[in-house]
C-alpha cells in the first residue's frame, strides 16, 4: 500500500475560519494532540502576519518532536525571514517553509498586477532565497485549479529548479470537479520535469462540497501528500476534513490501496478538543464526528443494529475513539484518575497547567457532582486560554420573572479599581450585558451568541461563545458556568478585555490606562 503524508493546517488555514482564533497555548495543546494523532506535518501559522502568529509557530516548534513543523510565507523576503526566525532552533529535517504566489489569470490581473514572467522570476528568486535557510521547501501556486496548465507546469518547473522539495496544488476556491482535478494531477505528474523527485501535494477547499472527493481523486492520480484540517474547518466553506479523508481510506481499503500514519482511535478526542477550543460545533450529521453518526431512530434500523451492527454501520464508534461511557469522574476522584482520563484522550499537560485543570475540576465536581467528558474538554480549553488580567466579574445580581422587567447589577474589578452599574433589559442576559456596557462606558454590538450544553443532564454547564463588534472590529469571548447568565457575562467581559488590551486601554498585567 502506498503511504500518503498528512499535512495538517488546522492551526493555520483552519484558524482562518471566522471565530476560530486560538491563543498560543491552545495552539500548542492542539499541536500536541495532532502529534499524538499521527500527522506528518503541522502548519503552525503565518509568522510575519502578527507577533502572536510568530510566537505560536515558535512555541509549537519547541513543543512537538515527531512532525515536521511548517511556517507560511509569501514570495517576500521579510516573510521568509520571519519563518526562519520562528523555526531556526528546530532540526533541519523537522522544519519546512511553505512559500506561495498566485498564478491564475484573475489573480495576475486584479491582485498581483503582474505578467507571467514577473511571477516566474519571483518564484525563482524567493524559492531560491528560502532554500538558503531550509532543506525542506514547499511551493504552492495559489489558485492552481484555475491556472492555464502550460503556465502551471512552467511555474512548478521553476520552483523545483530553485530547490522546492514539495509541490502543492491548491484548489483555492473549491472550484474543481474530481475528474478534472485528478486529470490535472496526472498531467502535472507526467509533464513537470523533476516532479518525480519531490512530493506532490494537494490543498482542496470545500466551496462546492468536493474537497474530500478532489483530494481522493488527486491521490488516485499520483499525489503523495494531502493537506487537511480537523473537522474540515477553514476559510469560507472549509478544507478537506482530516477525519473524512482518513476514514475513507480505512473503510474502503478494498478499493483504495493507500494508508496514512493516523491513529484513528484519537480522531474523536482530537475533534472534541478542537470544538471546545474554537467553539465551532460540527453539525450533528457531520460525517465521522457528528453527534448523529452512530444514532439510529428508525425502528427497522434499530432492530438491525441490535442484531448485527454492520447492518447499518460501516465502522465502529471505537474506530474513531468514541465511547458510550461519558460519565467519568466525581467529587472524590483524585489527581491520578484525572490525569489518566486526560491522557486516554491524548491530552498531555505540564504540571502547572494540570494543577490548574485539577483545581477547576474539583470546583466543578463540588457544584454539579458528576463530571462528563465534555466538561473535561471545556475545562482544559478554558485553562489553556492565555490569561487576560483585565476586568473580572466580582459579583452580579439578576432580578427577573415572567411578570417583571429584568434587571441586572454588576461589580467589575481590574487591579484595585472597581466599577458598578445596574440596568434593565429584554431578558436577564440582555440586562447584564447592558449593565456591563454602562459600567465600562462601551457600546459594543453583539454579532454572534452561541450557547451549548457541556455534558449531559439537568446540571450540565452552559458554554457561551460570542462575538462583539467594537468600533468596526470583531472580538470573540467565551465563558463557562452552570449558570448561563454568569457564563454569558464572563464571555462578554472576555471579549471587551481583548478590545481594551488591543487598543492599549488596558495593560496585559492588569489595570486600566
Curated annotation (Swiss-Prot):
Cofactor(s), names only, from the UniProt record: Mn(2+)
SUPFAM superfamilies: 2-isopropylmalate synthase LeuA, allosteric (dimerisation) domain, Aldolase
Coiled coil: none
InterPro entries from the UniProt entry: 2-IPM_HCS-like, 2-isopropylmalate_synth_dimer, AIPM/Hcit_synth_CS, Aldolase_TIM, LeuA/HCS_post-cat, LeuA_allosteric_dom_sf, LeuA_bact_synth, PYR_CT
Pathway(s) the chain acts in: Amino-acid biosynthesis; L-leucine biosynthesis; L-leucine from 3-methyl-2-oxobutanoate: step 1/4
GO BP terms: L-leucine biosynthetic process
Record key words, sorted: Amino-acid biosynthesis, Branched-chain amino acid biosynthesis, Cytoplasm, Leucine biosynthesis, Manganese, Metal-binding, Transferase
Entries under PROSITE patterns matching the protein: AIPM_HOMOCIT_SYNTH_1, AIPM_HOMOCIT_SYNTH_2, PYR_CT
Domain Pyruvate carboxyltransferase: 4-268
Domain of life from the UniProt record: Bacteria
Nucleus as UniProt keyword: no
Cell compartments where the protein resides: Cytoplasm
Record-listed Mn(2+) binding positions: 13, 203, 205, 239
Reaction(s) catalysed by this chain's protein: 3-methyl-2-oxobutanoate + acetyl-CoA + H2O = (2S)-2-isopropylmalate + CoA + H(+)
Region spans: Regulatory domain: 392-513
Gene Ontology CC annotation, any one: cytoplasm
Record-linked PANTHER family: 2-ISOPROPYLMALATE SYNTHASE 1, CHLOROPLASTIC-RELATED (PTHR10277:SF9), HOMOCITRATE SYNTHASE-RELATED (PTHR10277)
Subunit structure: Homodimer.
Family in the record: Belongs to the alpha-IPM synthase/homocitrate synthase family. LeuA type 1 subfamily.
Name of the protein in question: 2-isopropylmalate synthase
Organism: Thermotoga petrophila (strain ATCC BAA-488 / DSM 13995 / JCM 10881 / RKU-1)
Classification of source organism: Bacteria, Thermotogati, Thermotogota, Thermotogae, Thermotogales
Amino acid at each position: 500500500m502506498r503511504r500518503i503524508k498528512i499535512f495538517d493546517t488546522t492551526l493555520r488555514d483552519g484558524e482562518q475560519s471566522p471565530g476560530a482564533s486560538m491563543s498560543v497555548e491552545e495552539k500548542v495543546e492542539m499541536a500536541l494532540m495532532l502529534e499524538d494523532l499521527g500527522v506528518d506535518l503541522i502548519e503552525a501559522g503565518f509568522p510575519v502576519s502578527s507577533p502572536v502568529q510568530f510566537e505560536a509557530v515558535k512555541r509549537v516548534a519547541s513543543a512537538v518532536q515527531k512532525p515536521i513543523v511548517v511556517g507560511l510565507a509569501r514570495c517576500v523576503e521579510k516573510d521568509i525571514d520571519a519563518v526562519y526566525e520562528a523555526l531556526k532552533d528546530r532540526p533541519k529535517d523537522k522544519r519546512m517553509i511553505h512559500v506561495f504566489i498566485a498564478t491564475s489569470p484573475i489573480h495576475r490581473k486584479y491582485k498581483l498586477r503582474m505578467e507571467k514572467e514577473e511571477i516566474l522570476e519571483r518564484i525563482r528568486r524567493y524559492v531560491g532565497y528560502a532554500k538558503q535557510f531550509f532543506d525542506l521547501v514547499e511551493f504552492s501556486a495559489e489558485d492552481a485549479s484555475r491556472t492555464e496548465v502550460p503556465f502551471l507546469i512552467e511555474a512548478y518547473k521553476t520552483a523545483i529548479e530553485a530547490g522546492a522539495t514539495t509541490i502543492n496544488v491548491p484548489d483555492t476556491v473549491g472550484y474543481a470537479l474530481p475528474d478534472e482535478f485528478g486529470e490535472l494531477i496526472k498531467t502535472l505528474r507526467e509533464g513537470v520535469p523533476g516532479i518525480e523527485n519531490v512530493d506532490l501535494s494537494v490543498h482542496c477547499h470545500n466551496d462546492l462540497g468536493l474537497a474530500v472527493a478532489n483530494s481522493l481523486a488527486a491521490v488516485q492520480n499520483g499525489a503523495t501528500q494531502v493537506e487537511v484540517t480537523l473537522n474540515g474547518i477553514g476559510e469560507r466553506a472549509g478544507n478537506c476534513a482530516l477525519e473524512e479523508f482518513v476514514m475513507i481510506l480505512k473503510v474502503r481499503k478494498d478499493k483504495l490501496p493507500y494508508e496514512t500514519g493516523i491513529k484513528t482511535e484519537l480522531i474523536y478526542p482530537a475533534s472534541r478538543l478542537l470544538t471546545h477550543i474554537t467553539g465551532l460545533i460540527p453539525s450533528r450529521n457531520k460525517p465521522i464526528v457528528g453527534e448523529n453518526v452512530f444514532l439510529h431512530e428508525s425502528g427497522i434500523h434499530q432492530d438491525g443494529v441490535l442484531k448485527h451492527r454492520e447492518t447499518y454501520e460501516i465502522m465502529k464508534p471505537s474506530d474513531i475513539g468514541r465511547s458510550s461511557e461519558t460519565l467519568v469522574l466525581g467529587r472524590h476522584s483524585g489527581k491520578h484518575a484525572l490525569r489518566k482520563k486526560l491522557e486516554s484522550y491524548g491530552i498531555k499537560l505540564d504540571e502547572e497547567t494540570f494543577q490548574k485543570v485539577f483545581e477547576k475540576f474539583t470546583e466543578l465536581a463540588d457544584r454539579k457532582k458528576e463530571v462528563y467528558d465534555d466538561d473535561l474538554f471545556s475545562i482544559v480549553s478554558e485553562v489553556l486560554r492565555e490569561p487576560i488580567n483585565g476586568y473580572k466579574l466580582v459579583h452580579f445580581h439578576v432580578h427577573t420573572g415572567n411578570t417583571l422587567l429584568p434587571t441586572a447589577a454588576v461589580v467589575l474589578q481590574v487591579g484595585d479599581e472597581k466599577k458598578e452599574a445596574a440596568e434593565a433589559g429584554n431578558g436577564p442576559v440582555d440586562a447584564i450585558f447592558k449593565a456591563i456596557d454602562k459600567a465600562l462606558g462601551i457600546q459594543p454590538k453583539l454579532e454572534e451568541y452561541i450557547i451549548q450544553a457541556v455534558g449531559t443532564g439537568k446540571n450540565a454547564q452552559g458554554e457561551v461563545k460570542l462575538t462583539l463588534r467594537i468600533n468596526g472590529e470583531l472580538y470573540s469571548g467565551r465563558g463557562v458556568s452552570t449558570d448561563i447568565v454568569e457564563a454569558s457575562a464572563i464571555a462578554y467581559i472576555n471579549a471587551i478585555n481583548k478590545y481594551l488590551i488591543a487598543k492599549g486601554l488596558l495593560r496585559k498585567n492588569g489595570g486600566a490606562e
